[in-house]
Design a protein with these regions (language model features):
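Short, flexible helix-loop junctions that flank or precede catalytic/ligand sites
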Residues: 1-214
Length: 214
């Protein structure tokens, strides 16, 4: 499973929550191994082992070699699930696919703007099409973004303010959903410090590849 999104979209937090969820699901009985550079969060769980990469930052090839070696060494520890912080080059990508071929449940991230873009990015890295287009190996494509949430105290009803919105937006909303349940950004209030928004939430695009899709 590959998770994508722009920098700051919460990918690392999603992986943390996913790994902790897997550990809880199996009651700590599964071996979950992470390889990260560096670990961004403490991932807690009985069966979870976090592994930071160690390499000479002054050597331009050291990082690439460290990722490839770290993934290969991690496979030898026979984890049930493995989380790789990021697929950065062909060596890491091939190592990840090899892990999937041996039955390891593998999660990682890429920088793309869409779920479908993950496939193109892996292709650009040089992954063998025989591996890339096998839905038994590439089982999930996920792209996520963080979007601001409307302030619950000052948000306003879409129906009452649609005359202030772009016509194409109004038509699209009316076509896709029940407008009585739609709200738009309000004028701001003390609770949101005048911004009209309060907090952020994930919006995710999820593709589960099939043979026909690939």
């Amino acid at each position: 499973n590959i998770l994508s999104g722009p920098t700051g979209s919460g990918k690392s937090m999603t992986l943390k929550v996913t790994m902790e969820g897997l550990d809880k699901l199996h009651g700590g009985s599964k071996h979950i191994l992470t390889i990260e550079d560096p670990p961004e969060y403490r991932i807690r769980g009985e069966g979870i082992n976090q592994t930071p990469l160690v390499y000479d930052a002054t050597d331009p090839d050291a990082e690439r070699q460290a990722w490839a070696a770290g993934i290969a060494n991690g496979m030898r520890l026979d984890p049930d699930y493995m989380m790789i912080g990021e697929v950065r080059d062909l060596f890491a990508a091939v190592a990840a696919f090899r892990g999937a071929m041996t039955g390891h449940g593998l999660w990682s991230t890429l920088h793309t703007n869409s779920a479908i873009g993950i496939v193109q990015r892996l292709k650009d890295l040089g992954v063998d099409p025989g591996l890339l287009f096998d839905p038994a190996l590439l089982t999930g494509l996920i792209n996520q973004s963080l979007l601001p949430k409307l302030c619950p105290h000052c948000k306003v009803r879409f129906q009452d303010h649609q005359d202030q919105l772009a016509l194409d937006l109004v038509e699209r909303v009316q076509r896709l959903t029940d407008v009585s349940q739609v709200y738009v950004k309000g004028p701001g209030c003390q609770a949101c410090r005048g911004s009209g928004v309060n907090g952020r939430s994930i919006v995710a695009e999820v593709v589960l590849p099939t043979l026909a899709f690939m």
